[in-house]
């Protein structure tokens, strides 16, 4: 694991990820950008659909989804960074998610 002095974060409003082609293109783009953290808005997933967020090299995936196919947010944290999760706060309607944790023993909130 490489230790850097900065954390690269990208955030995207994806306006729905139910189409396989869109998920594939997004995965390729994320891999090309190489961020440590990726925040996604408007995933439009139902709770049962979140398996679609899986991506090689990104084992930590946190999400908040409503019961309908609208809203939805997700935060992916790359395996390249040693993030230790302490607490997660989710909106049951899928509008926000807050993750408290630490990186190299320094507290962070995403």
Where are the regions that the model predicts?
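Short phosphate/oxyanion-binding micro-motifs
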Residues: 1-110
């Amino acid at each position: 694991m490489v230790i850097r002095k900065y954390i690269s974060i990208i955030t995207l409003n994806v306006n729905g990820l139910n189409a396989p082609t869109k998920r594939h293109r997004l995965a390729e783009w994320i891999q090309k950008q190489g961020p440590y953290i990726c925040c996604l808005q408007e995933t439009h997933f139902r709770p049962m659909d979140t398996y679609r967020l899986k991506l090689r090299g990104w084992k930590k995936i946190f999400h908040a989804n409503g019961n309908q196919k609208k809203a939805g947010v997700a935060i992916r944290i790359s395996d390249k960074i040693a993030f230790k999760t302490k607490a997660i706060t989710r909106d049951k309607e899928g509008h926000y998610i807050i993750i408290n944790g630490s990186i190299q023993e320094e507290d962070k909130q995403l």
